[in-house]
UniProtKB/Swiss-Prot annotation:
The lineage of its organism: Bacteria, Pseudomonadati, Pseudomonadota, Betaproteobacteria, Burkholderiales. InterPro entries: AceK_kinase (IPR046855), AceK_regulatory (IPR046854), Isocitrate_DH_AceK (IPR010452). Belongs to the AceK family. Disulfide bonds: none annotated. Transmembrane segments: none annotated. Keywords: ATP-binding, Cytoplasm, Glyoxylate bypass, Hydrolase, Kinase, Nucleotide-binding, Protein phosphatase, Serine/threonine-protein kinase, Transferase, Tricarboxylic acid cycle. It catalyses: L-seryl-[isocitrate dehydrogenase] + ATP = O-phospho-L-seryl-[isocitrate dehydrogenase] + ADP + H(+). GO terms for cellular component: cytoplasm. The keyword Transit peptide does not apply. Bifunctional enzyme which can phosphorylate or dephosphorylate isocitrate dehydrogenase (IDH) on a specific serine residue. This is a regulatory mechanism which enables bacteria to bypass the Krebs cycle via the glyoxylate shunt in response to the source of carbon. When bacteria are grown on glucose, IDH is fully active and unphosphorylated, but when grown on acetate or ethanol, the activity of IDH declines drastically concomitant with its phosphorylation. This is Isocitrate dehydrogenase kinase/phosphatase. One of its GO terms (molecular function) is protein serine/threonine kinase activity. The active site is at D383.
Length: 605
């Protein structure tokens, strides 16, 4: 039954709707300005500036929401507006969105503002956008001077080499390329290596998204090759090879490789999108099966991703019958974790009390999760979705889980009819706990898991992250086989840690003691002491000493800390180094290096 008013007679309703849309437009203008600035920072190789920009953009949305809430309360006494006017506000807002180019994001912004003002009993489709109201299908900017979502190129006309060069140069990056002809030849060789020689169908064409995707020290060209009924995805990272010179680093031609660079464990891209739904639809064609929620999140629209995820959860609950259960595995000291077996995510709640030796607070743990949200995750830390007042049907909660919730988090529970409302929780992608992966894996899987674990910790170290608790249970293995850290309550900046060697024992009593014979400060870390906790399994030990024998040497950790203190930002690649053109086709680089020996020496370094 439709409860909406027949007439839109409230001037306040229209004014409130217009004010809300103005604040959304301000938010999205800032969002796009950040992407434009990212291009300038990339061209100048200002990596610290790019990091700062990415951090600031994450908080921008909440700042605009709060500004909007304050204006509505001050100017319209929003909390006193009656139900009929609130319904008119939504209808007026829908009317304002009919020709908008980001309607889905504007609807999410409306929800964010309303959830700050209205009681949760209003969180239904009469008052907020539980379901979308404006279609984004075939949405484009039709203005003559507008940049299209993607450009189409036809290699059959000018040849593949000329077409690829045009694709790159159309982005009009300011620094020149070291040797673009060489890089184009590498792209063509990689395509041949991957697909062999294929016959060009009449519809042979290349589609390329019109904006670059910026993250870390790379700018990605993203597109697809169309040939007959085949859709072949690709991404080309552009990097600085030395001051003032660019190069194409590789071409990624497999869906699994693109899914990794767009994964939940990486920081968000900075990309300029006039019509974000069109970009997301394009990306869905090259990564089918990847949820739209994750794609919106990966391109920096994390609130839209969060909204879509919640809709996906509600849809899944209405089309499934299994129950939420306590997550299998070793229980954590600070988090209660549960899951729905048919849904590939875990739900994490901070406990009311923490047993010794944990010395922390709810506020401190929330700050750690916020630190990770704002930090460069490098594909090694899981992103989290944070929710408040989540209502779950009691009939879908396992009795053992309800008992566990009532025992561990009673302050966060509220019974409301047939639902249990959880006042605060985090949601993450479900992964295989690394301890179980190593325990149950084949010899090859154990070696892979250990190698990945060492790589993950070393990369986090270089990114100024000390995990704190190094146990395998705090790491997970993704469906792509990457090891990712996901337990953040003890996380610290490496530069805040004091890397120490274990002092030699003073006597035999010290040597036999089960307790440290030396003082340990709150920020002291002793890499030499990690061995007994990590190397108990003979298979794990053999793999660890094969791939990461230096892991327990304090010098490794101190060297990373020293470089960070000197302001150095190391290079990170979300793909295997063997895929880089300079590694894969070294003979093509020799001619360039022979013409400029200093370049070759710099690349080798």
């Amino acid at each position: 039954m439709n409860h909406f008013p027949k007439l839109l007679s409230s001037q306040i309703g229209f004014d409130v709707a217009q004010s809300m849309l103005e604040y959304f437009d301000r938010h999205y203008r800032i969002f796009r300005e950040a992407a434009v600035e990212a291009k300038a920072l990339f061209e100048r190789a200002d990596w610290h500036g790019l990091q700062r920009l990415a951090r600031e953009r994450i908080t921008s949305y909440d700042e605009r929401v709060q500004e909007c809430v304050e204006v509505l309360q001050d100017e319209y006494d929003a909390e006193s507006i009656d139900d009929e006017v609130w319904q008119q506000i939504k209808l007026h807002y829908i009317g304002l969105l009919t020709s908008h180019r980001q309607p889905e994001c504007a609807e999410t912004f409306f929800n964010s503002v309303c959830c700050k003002i209205l009681h949760r009993s209003y969180f239904n489709n009469d008052f907020i956008f539980v379901r979308p109201a404006i279609s984004t299908e075939y949405l484009e900017n039709d203005e003559p001077a507008a940049k299209p979502t993607y450009r189409a190129y036809y290699p059959g006309t000018d040849g593949l080499a000329v077409t690829l060069e045009r694709i790159v140069t159309n982005f009009q990056l300011e620094p020149p390329f070291e040797d673009l002809a060489r890089d184009i030849a590498c792209v063509m060789q990689a395509i041949h290596d991957e697909f062999g020689r294929f016959d060009e169908a009449p519809n042979f064409q290349i589609h390329v998204l019109s904006s670059l995707f910026f993250r870390n020290k790379s700018a990605y060209i993203v597109g697809r090759i169309i040939n007959a009924d085949r859709v072949l995805p690709f991404a080309v990272p552009i990097r600085h090879v030395r001051p003032g010179l660019l190069a194409l680093d590789t071409v990624l031609l497999r869906r699994d490789l693109l899914q990794i660079i767009f994964s939940f464990s990486h920081s968000y891209f900075l990309v300029d999108m006039d019509v974000p739904s069109a970009y997301v639809d394009f990306l869905c064609t090259i990564m089918p099966g990847k949820p739209k929620a994750e794609i919106y999140t990966s391109v920096g629209l994390q609130k839209q991703g969060k909204n879509l995820f919640y809709r996906d959860l509600l849809h899944h609950l209405s089309h499934s019958s299994d129950r939420f259960i306590v997550a299998p595995g070793i229980k954590g000291l600070v988090m209660l974790v549960f899951t729905l077996p048919s849904f590939p995510y875990v739900f994490k709640i901070i406990k009311d009390h923490f047993p010794p030796p944990k010395e922390t607070t709810r506020r401190q743990i929330m700050e750690k999760y916020l630190l990770v949200k704002r930090h460069d995750r490098l594909g090694r830390m899981a992103d989290t979705l944070e929710y408040s007042s989540v209502a779950l049907p009691l009939a879908r909660l396992d009795h053992a889980l309800v008992r566990e919730l009532e025992k561990e988090v009673p302050s966060l529970l509220e019974y409301e009819g047939d639902n249990l409302v959880i006042k605060h929780l985090y949601i993450e992608r479900r992964m295989t706990p690394l301890n179980l992966y190593l325990q149950n894996g084949t010899d090859a899987e154990v070696e892979h898991g250990v190698k990945e674990y060492g790589n993950a910790v070393k990369e986090l170290m270089k990114a100024n992250i000390f995990p704190g608790d190094m146990l395998y249970k705090n790491f997970g293995v993704t469906r792509h086989g990457r090891v990712v850290f996901y337990d953040y309550d003890e996380i610290e900046y490496l530069t805040d840690c004091n890397v120490r060697r274990v002092p030699p024992p003073r006597n035999e009593e010290d040597e036999l003691s089960g307790e440290p014979w030396y003082t340990v400060g709150p920020h002291d870390i002793f890499p030499e002491t990690y061995g007994p906790f990590l190397l108990g399994d003979p298979r794990v030990r053999a793999a660890f000493l094969k791939h990461h024998a230096d892991f327990f040497d304090p010098a490794l950790w101190q060297a990373s800390k020293d470089k960070l203190l000197q302001g150095e930002l190391p290079d990170f690649f979300p793909y295997d180094a063997s895929l880089r053109f300079c590694v894969r086709y070294p003979e093509r680089f020799r001619a360039t290096d022979e013409r400029a020996p200093a370049r070759g020496a710099q690349r080798a370094a």
